[in-house]
């Protein structure tokens, strides 16, 4: 069996290479367990001063979870007693990483999505290359942005946070630096030079001092931010998404369907679980007041609900397995959504709009 996770120690830096290029490094259960095993070993190794997450393919850092494997072996496997076993283990890994005792560095390139973001977003230093396509597309799969990433999405301006969280649209390297999701934006040709400096610095420094020295070196390679899709369309994002309810977002889009930008997003949102869209809309505001660990715990609760009622099964089947893009959602429109159920799931008494209007 091919090693999808390859650990390597270079002087005092432990490197975890993701090595499943055929699936764009999509994470399966064995990969998640292997990463945890390596990290625990290195955390207790005095010779290791820092850990680097990297990929052996330029096409992706990590495209998220292996959805086909997840669907077959967990969601549709009646023998599996714990259908949430994959997520519970993955989320515990992400919480462990968030509290890791040694400096963590991540190399974002190509596709960076879902579980790959969860694996790396709490790194002490994130290096982004120009090829990055960063996104949390979970609403198209019958659930919501998970692995604690809404803790970060909630820090974005309201309109952009909904654009990313509800519509699942991506961010580019310049966006990631601009909104403090990544620390440096470099040309791919400079990456090895920066890592060589990391290796040299790890011989002298450790902990926070090592990261501060690495940040100084990184500034030498930091590229000027470029105009991105988000920049070019920011006025439209504000116009359609800077709203106090999902109903208002829909209304704004409906009134501007002659705009191709609005039409495309409107059609996408209408094809998704309206219940989960309402959950994500409210979750954006809720996560502003939660810690990362609390956000992860909430994510697991929402995912368990999505598994129990079949929303995730239908979403993955539609988008990944059968590719008919018809998820058979019970809630065909916002009017079908029981907001009491949304509030109960999130543990809130009032929606954002209800709280705002008090």
Predicted segments, located by residue:
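Glycine-rich beta-to-alpha active-site loop
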Residues: 97-141, 164, 168, 173, ...
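Hydrophobic/aromatic residues within transmembrane alpha-helices
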Residues: 53, 66, 119-120, 175-176, ...
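Glycine- (often His-adjacent) and acidic-residue-rich active-site loop
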Residues: 55-89, 345
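Glycine-rich phosphate-binding loop at the start of an alpha helix
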Residues: 84-87, 91, 114, 170, ...
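Short, flexible helix-coil linker/hinge segments at the edges of structured domains or between repeats
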Residues: 75, 79-83, 127-130, 135-159, ...
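C-terminal alpha-helix plus adjacent terminal tail
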Residues: 2-6, 189-199, 203-358
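Contiguous mid-protein beta-loop-alpha structural module that forms a pocket-lining wall or clamp
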Residues: 148, 155-209
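Conserved CoA-thioester-binding segment of acyl-CoA-metabolizing enzymes
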Residues: 1-54, 95-96, 356-358
């Amino acid at each position: 069996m091919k090693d999808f996770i390859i650990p390597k120690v270079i002087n005092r830096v432990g490197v975890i290479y993701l090595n499943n290029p055929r699936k764009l490094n999509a994470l399966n259960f064995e990969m998640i367990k292997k990463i945890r095993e390596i990290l625990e070993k290195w955390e207790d190794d005095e010779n290791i001063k820092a850990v680097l997450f990297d990929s052996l393919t330029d096409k992706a850092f990590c495209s998220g979870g292996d959805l086909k494997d997840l669907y077959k072996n967990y969601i549709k496997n009646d023998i599996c007693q714990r259908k949430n076993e994959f997520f519970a283990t993955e989320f515990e890994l992400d919480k462990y990483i968030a509290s890791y005792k040694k400096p963590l560095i991540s190399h974002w390139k190509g596709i960076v999505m879902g579980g790959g973001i969860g694996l790396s977003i709490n790194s002490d230093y994130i290096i982004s290359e120009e090829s990055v396509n960063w996104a949390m597309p979970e609403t198209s799969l019958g659930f919501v942005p998970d692995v604690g990433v809404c803790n970060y999405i909630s820090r974005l301006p309201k309109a952009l946070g909904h654009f990313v969280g509800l519509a699942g649209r991506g961010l580019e390297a310049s966006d990631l630096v601009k909104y403090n999701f990544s620390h440096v934006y470099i040309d791919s040709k400079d990456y090895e030079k920066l890592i060589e400096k990391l290796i040299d610095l790890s011989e002298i420094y450790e902990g926070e001092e090592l990261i501060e020295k690495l940040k100084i070196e990184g500034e030498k390679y930091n590229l000027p931010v470029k105009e991105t899709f988000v920049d070019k369309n920011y006025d439209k994002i504000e116009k359609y998404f800077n709203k106090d309810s999902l109903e208002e977002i829909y209304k704004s889009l409906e009134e501007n369907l002659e705009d191709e930008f609005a039409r495309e997003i409107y059609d996408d949102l209408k094809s998704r679980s309206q219940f989960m869209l309402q959950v994500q809309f409210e979750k954006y505001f809720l996560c502003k007041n939660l810690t990362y660990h609390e956000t992860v715990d909430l994510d697991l609760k929402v995912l368990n609900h999505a598994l129990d009622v079949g929303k995730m099964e239908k979403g993955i089947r539609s988008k990944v397995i059968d590719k008919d893009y018809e998820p058979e959602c019970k809630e065909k429109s916002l009017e079908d959504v029981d907001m009491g159920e949304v509030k109960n799931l999130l543990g809130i008494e009032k929606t954002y709009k209800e709280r705002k209007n008090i």
